[in-house]
Amino acid sequence: MFPHLKGHGQRVNLQLLQEAACRELLQQLDRIEGSKVIVLDETMIGPLDLVTRPKLFADRGIRLLALKPELHLPREVANVVYVMRPRVALMEQLAAHVKAGGRAAAGRQYHILFAPRRSCLCVSQLEVSGVLGSFGNIEELAWNYLPLDVDLVSMEMPNAFRDVSVDGDTSSLYQAAVGLVQLQRLYGRIPKIYGKGEFAHRVWEHAKQLGRDERTLYNGDKGVVDQLILLDRSIDLLSPLATQLTYEGLIDEFYGIRQNKLTLPAENFPSDGALPGGGGSGPRVEESQSLLGDTEKKTILLHSGEQLYAELRNKHFNEVTKLLARKAREIHVQMHATSQDKSVQEIKSFVENLLPQLMAQKKATSEHTAIAGLLHEQVNAVRFADDLAAEQEFMVCADIDKPSAYIEDLIACRVELNRVLRLICMQCHAASGFKEKLLNHYKRELVHVYGLEVLLTISNLEKSGLLHLQTESRAYSVLRKTLHLTVDDNVEIEPKDISYVHSFYAPLTARIVEHSLKPLGWQTLKSQINNLPGPTFEDFQAQLVGIGGRHTVTTVSEGSLLNVPRVVLVCFVGGCTFAEIAALRFLAAQEDNNVEFLIATTKVVNKHSFLDSLMSS
């Protein structure tokens, strides 16, 4: 169903995770007899697409609908199955929908599948609303980590960092721990665990306790994953705020990639001609219309199963335009090669076999050229260049202890608040906090222009650690030098260092992982990252020597074990960016490292979505 998840030579087969999630859903549906429709909370539409295809429901005669106030259900349907996030705020809408449906069709049965777990608060709210008796089954789908790509899984919880740091809701930490146990159930016990940060430590403590409860499932079974690195988002708040300069990162920042899908106005793309044959590797338009879709929009799938995108995604944007131009020339040469010296049989073979592939490659190149063109307009805008210059000055600690003239100009011009706050937070992080006088100066300026309500947002930023008073440690300034977070002579095309993802800044999280790969790396690293917030921890799980992982792709002899890359699971608690992911993929591509990464995150974020989650009420 999702062949791109298996990968080529990957030791961790994420198809197993997808199949387990799909199987769990079907088992729940099969327990419900009679005709049925599935009504989805809007935040569950994307996750559902990650584990199954619409055809699977069509084959079973099940319709998919989005939960909206104006939704009317078919009268003949006997069962309505709601698939929802366990959010109390949704229960009022759900109760109203059930009451309206009950009046329209007597005898109809309702069911709820909460993902990733059942909520007692939600059930209590349904009871208060007087509709609890209408529900036959109230179950849960243990969808913790969902596979986005061959090396990437996500909990799809965009507010996880805010929930924990601002609201004090630690349920996402528990779910991350449950997800780690689930991964070990599928792929075997992870023997070595390293981590940094308070929330990361709490995730591991939960996972360890849950693992003890499930000891019989994988006791002593050394799995395919050799090492786990847990990183708390709060140890590096600069990277999620920084402008990403990889192709994938820029797409996400300007247009948003949601569950591997990019949706843009169809007018931006060349019309789709009929392609001979069925082969090719171009970006595939999703077969089914999105439940929230717009017929004037075009949706393109972006994952490693699309060959051209896999080649472009982690490149610096300056390299992408050159690669696309070269690819277009190559296709043109192949398609217009002279046929004078070819036999009829050779021409027939070309038309039947090679031509469909070339047409698909041409379509993919054309579409990505259109996307790159849209990005080029954004990147060449004056505001983009000015903002980038300002944040890069902060990254090298230039004039970080006094008010920024650029930020003050933005405030005076009353630009959008997010844009101003992002730069203020970046300056604060680079300075390891503001002196009280400087922090109060910015607060006064913001209140004067944006009103008193801005203080509520500032309070959230202070609770989350994005704004705070200066500490004596000067952690960022020290780490910038000891871990080489900024590289002056960085190369963007065919780079030699991970700093290319931000042109000259290496994400701290990725640099920590890079150093941990070295012999005695974590032991050496501990003293360097000691000034970062939260504990530095390590743990080891008992294993039986010589027992292979239960889901390795290939079986290797003892003599060849040294040539097999070690598998490192890097888990971001609080979200990570595509730039950080690109940096880890760059490290995995270096032969000297002999490593394969599996990346887990609560959500893939960018500078806009990360800050927005903290600003919402």
Swiss-Prot record:
Cited InterPro entries: Sec-1-like_dom1, Sec1-like, Sec1-like_dom2, Sec1-like_sf, VPS33_dom3b
Positions of region (Disordered): 268-287
Disruption phenotype annotation: Flies display impaired deposition of pigment granules. Member of the 'granule group' of eye color genes as mutants affect deposition in pigment granules of two types of pigments, the ommochromes and drosopterins. RNAi-mediated knockdown results in late endosome fragmentation. RNAi-mediated knockdown causes impaired autophagosome clearance in fat body cells of starved or wandering 3rd instar (L3) larvae.
Membrane topology: Peripheral membrane protein
BP GO annotations: autophagosome maturation; cellular response to starvation; compound eye pigmentation; crinophagy; determination of adult lifespan; endocytosis; endosomal transport; endosome organization
GO CC term, one of those recorded: lysosomal membrane
Highest taxon listed in the record's lineage: Eukaryota
Broad class of where this protein is predominantly found: other
Keywords recorded for this protein, A-Z: Autophagy, Endosome, Lysosome, Membrane, Protein transport, Transport
GO terms, molecular function: SNARE binding; syntaxin binding
Subcellular localization: Early endosome; Late endosome membrane; Lysosome membrane
Function of the protein: Core component of the class C core vacuole/endosome tethering (CORVET) and the homotypic fusion and vacuole protein sorting (HOPS) tethering complexes involved in endo-lysosomal vesicle trafficking and lysosome biogenesis. The CORVET complex facilitates docking and fusion of endosomal vesicles during endosome maturation, acts upstream of HOPS, but is not involved in autophagic flux. The CORVET complex may cooperate with the early endosomal tether Rbsn-5 to mediate endosomal fusion.
Miscellaneous comment text of the record: The name 'carnation' was given due to the eye color phenotype caused by hypomorphic mutations in the car gene.
Subunit structure: Component of the class C core vacuole/endosome tethering (CORVET) complex composed of at least Vps8, dor/Vps18, car/Vps33A and Vps16A; unlike in other species, Vps11 is not part of the Drosophila complex. Due to the reduced number of components the Drosophila CORVET complex is often referred to as the miniCORVET complex. Interacts with ema. Component of the homotypic fusion and vacuole protein sorting (HOPS) complex, composed of Vps16A, car/Vps33A, dor/Vps18, Vps39, Vps11 and lt/Vps41.
Family as reported in the entry's similarity comment: Belongs to the STXBP/unc-18/SEC1 family.
Name of the protein in question: Vacuolar protein sorting-associated protein 33A
Organism: Drosophila melanogaster (Fruit fly)
Gene: car
